Amino acid sequence: MMKKFGRKALALSLTAVLGASMVLTGCGEDKKGEDTTAKIGLTTGLASDTTADISIMTWSGDSKYYEDIGSMDLSTDKLTSQNVAQVYSVAKQFKKLYPNIKINLWAKTGDPDQPGTPKWEQEMTSFKAKYGKYPDIWASTSVTNDIKKGLAADLSVFKDDETYKAYNKNLMSNLNYYGFQGGLPSFSIPWGIWVNKALAESKNINVPDPDWTIDEYTRFFTKSDNTSFWGDKSTPVNIINMGTTTINKQIKEKGTVDLDNDEVKSLLSYIPKWAASTIDVAEGAGTLSKDIKIESKTYSWYYFCNNRCLTNITDPWYLTAGADESAKESESYIDSKDWDIYPFPSTDYCGNTIKVVMDPICIHNYAADDGNKEWSDDEKAKLKATYTFATYWTASTEAKQAIFDQKWTDNGAEKSAAGDSFPVVTGDTYNKQMDIWNNLPAHKTYKDKEGWKEILKLWENNESWDYIDKCWTSKITEKGETTDVLYEWNNMWKEEVAGAWMTDKDWGDKVKARLSDWNTTINKRIETATKQLQDKLVENYNFDKSKFTSDNK
């Protein structure tokens, strides 16, 4: 059920962190008084002679520091990190538009919280100690925590900017807190369910259509022989999270959950059926062969790639690697002649839908630098320059094309720096950027996949009610202890939490008996976390308390 953050980091794109002290000249027009934005495809009116020094910090990199990377001439063999290659390509293009703006880059190797290295929060602090200030834009692992620290600027001041208005509203809403826009969407992809159609057909298992129901999904899932292949690596509880109106949907819309209701109780009966057809249960029972474990290194995605699972619900970030025919020897390549990605199945309560993966970026709250919460003209100018780069980077077609055209070296193979990430904008700009996405060789296989076509429809119509854990108060810290807000629900597979194992006959009854208490405990945590965020919005930003009643997020 739980995803591996490390595997996700390997597929990250557009998740850099900008940090710098800036010296700015100009605030909307060039020296001749002519607005140059129409010429360069930007909409903020930032003068072309603006001077700034911007440092980028990102994870999943190479732990090298690149000063003024946009002025460098790096050969493909020197670019061994996809994220570094992406930032390099965008900085080069931005340099043509703003020759006096320097972009520097430090890219941490591995994950933000890579084992054996400082946590991402500590890296942020170290950045400040080394460079004299916090990053200006960073890939955030918790936007609400960054707001509580007073680090993130409110970007709603740009709400009239045309680029701001072009962002996908569903993505932007996850970063909006009572009107406070805490960041911008960066790496974003739809999250569906991988389906190994060829494996199913080889076992004489009928493959449902992409508009499948939860019962069709269950019949398909449980046709596994549980010896050589299974339904999935782990129990797909996310089917219930997305198949009710009172869990993920209610978190997104109201910021609360309701676990103790008929919707949830009726769907709990599916869990023991699913669990019995998972690799996790086979491993726990000692029936999973050693050879199969070694073959896939016990990793959920590799089990799917090696035809050991009919489905995979936990690893959405292999859109490129899974389909890259130029890297068939890669462990991440799907070794199946026919596969697809389906939406989540419908239930009696919700239609087919998708989850969403989004990595947000935040922009530094310059007003806090001098201890005065009010914005000076100089601080506003810094914010405008940083926001201009951030929007060019994440939203412009020019940046997407530059990334597509840029090459990097992946284990000796030369590849495009483009990857999984979807456009984070809408309208004609979205269509143009999806054309670029579709032109990547590894992505061309998707055009003929029926499930994928449904995924695209749901994405484009914003038919997802998923919340983003990096944007919501998914964890709470009290007295130095950090707890998962949804701890009991997310750990109901543990005997010590539920009172039984998922495959036990009485598991469902024991969980149902606990739902009321879990509901109370979880919502108390949510209430506390929400109050902490509200208090810090007022303390750090002089935020208007009256706005707390107009939005339940």
Where are these regions (language model features)?
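Conserved N-terminal structural module of periplasmic/extracytoplasmic solute-binding proteins
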Residues: R7, A11-S13, G19-K149, Y164, ...
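Hinge/lid segment of periplasmic solute-binding proteins
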Residues: A38-L42, T109, D113-P118, W138-W191, ...
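Extracytoplasmic/periplasmic substrate-recognition and gating elements
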Residues: T58, A107, S330-G427
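Paired acidic/hydrophobic, glycine-rich loop segments that form the ligand-binding mouth/hinge
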Residues: D136-A139, L310-D315, A321-G322
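Glycine-centered hinge/linker elements that transmit conformational signals in sensory
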Residues: F221-K223, G255-T298, Y342-T347
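Long, aromatic- and glycine/proline-rich binding clefts that accommodate carbohydrate-like moieties
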Residues: F404-K505, D509, A513, D535-K553
